[in-house]
Amino acid sequence: MEDFVRQCFNPMIVELAEKAMKEYGEDPKIETNKFAAICTHLEVCFMYSDFHFIDERGESIIVESGDPNALLKHRFEIIEGRDRTMAWTVVNSICNTTGVEKPKFLPDLYDYKENRFIEIGVTRREVHIYYLEKANKIKSEKTHIHIFSFTGEEMATKADYTLDEESRARIKTRLFTIRQEMASRGLWDSFVSPKEAKRQLKKDLKSQEPCAGLPTKVSHRTSPALKTLEPMWMDSNRTAALRASFLKCQKK
């Protein structure tokens, strides 16, 4: 699974996931399913923000050309992927600027058009079950919840899906592709089932050989969302690195 993750996701997403796990004392080489889940969640957050801007009239627009326009502002602020200290700094700054209520838990995004924090969920289970778990944990009507599954299902607060259908379809397609790629390598069952995951871990520890059949070439796509990670905490070199294109699993 670890080899698959490093082949399937952008190196900067992998790095952010590793740092997040180490911050909580977790080892990506051992807890590989969690490693894959965190990388997937990060990519969904970036894709959620991709191409969405606010124009000078305050209207939400979609721009895919990548041409710079000084009158456009990113619609979403990405909070997920930052270390906890800086993430709370961003949240506090948003709250002070907009006057919105400070959440008790770190959200994943902030929507400048709707003026609300967003909690993104990616589940291997039933979407309604995961949604209820999220809602019960957050216990706040101010934070919008949007759940995606690997089967193409989704659920959002008050059935308000925030994004247009095409943008959501891109996310669903990516998740389905990840599922198919895992399944083709015999990794999906262990990713879904905790019992199977333990069995797979024991098997992985016995054999350190790289996973057969991993793609050696991947397609490239630039993600404008990575630019929104710039404020407050990145030097120019890291910003340039984050602007590197996403690496995707090779389609069969």
UniProtKB/Swiss-Prot annotation:
Keyword Hydrolase applies: no
Molecular functions (GO terms): RNA binding
Pfam family, one: Flu_PA
Coiled-coil segments: none
Annotated positions for site Important for efficient shutoff activity: K202, K203, K206
Location(s) in or outside the cell: Host cytoplasm; Host nucleus
Location, primary (coarse class): host cell
Active-site residue numbers: E80, D108
Alphabetized UniProt keyword annotations: Decay of host mRNAs by virus, Eukaryotic host gene expression shutoff by virus, Host cytoplasm, Host gene expression shutoff by virus, Host mRNA suppression by virus, Host nucleus, Host-virus interaction
Biological processes, Gene Ontology terms: viral RNA genome replication; viral translational frameshifting
Site keyed Important for efficient shutoff activity and nuclear localization: positions: K195, K198, R199
Domain of life of the native organism: Viruses
InterPro entries: PA/PA-X, PA/PA-X_sf
Biological function: Plays a major role in the shutoff of the host protein expression by cleaving mRNAs probably via an endonuclease activity. This host shutoff allows the virus to escape from the host antiviral response. Hijacks host RNA splicing machinery to selectively target host RNAs containing introns for destruction. This may explain the preferential degradation of RNAs that have undergone co- or post-transcriptional processing.
Family listed: Belongs to the influenza viruses PA-X family.
Record remark: domains: The probable endonuclease active site in the N-terminus and the basic amino acid cluster in the C-terminus are important for the shutoff activity. The C-terminus acts as a nuclear localization signal. The C-terminus is recruited to host protein complexes involved in nuclear Pol II RNA processing.
Protein's recorded name: Protein PA-X
Classification of source organism: Viruses, Riboviria, Orthornavirae, Negarnaviricota, Polyploviricotina
